């Protein structure tokens, strides 16, 4: 409405839909997820809420959000990171791809160890992925 008033419009054309309370809540959640300023962890949490609260499967959520099912699966995987890991990732402005690279590691301790190196050395995504792969390779050699 504010934009219409700023443009000097006296009336705003619109379409009114009569929808259920459940569908209204789903639409509101979908709109929030699609906002540009939502962090990738917030987006993942909202998708998880959409799926669990409304009894959806990933394909349903993907359809509602206009995303591929694989994108939804990747977003949900981010929630495997601990709150401490998420805080470091967000606090040091690391990307979703940094976070996904860390998910290849088996334990929180390993992820924190690598995460500290990423932060200390200001590694980009490519170098982070290489560090993770090298760590996994060295671990296999030791076993």
Where are these regions (language model features)?
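Amphipathic alpha-helical extensions and coiled-coil-like segments
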Residues: 35-38, 42-143
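A short, basic-hydrophobic beta/loop patch
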Residues: 1-40, 88
